[in-house]
Amino acid sequence: MKAKSAIESQKELLKKVIEVINNIKKEINIIDVYVVGSRARGDYLDTSDLDLVIISDDFKNLRYIERLEKLYKYSKGDIEFFAFTKEEWDNPKSLFIINMKREAKRLEDLAKSYDINF
């Protein structure tokens, strides 16, 4: 069982991420959002950052660095972004994305599991 401080850090970080996503939605048409890494697997510490996959077709024709530039201006420091189009996410051509998808949890589902509205 997770320590209370780790669970509280997960809830607080999820609330912060939802606020960040709502701000990003003002500029980018987001199709879906996934949490990956330790926060998705459940092996996080209370100091762990949150790895977030943003799916948007607004990323088409943008170099990867340009995608991240669009996202990082919204970052609160403890969020790591990954940015893919729907096609890249649905039909991955790299092991990196394939492995990411194995552990991915939809942000909306993860938030609900902590009784957080999204």
Task: Give the location of each predicted region.
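Short beta-strand->loop micro-motif that forms the acidic, two-metal-ion catalytic signature
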Residues: 51-54
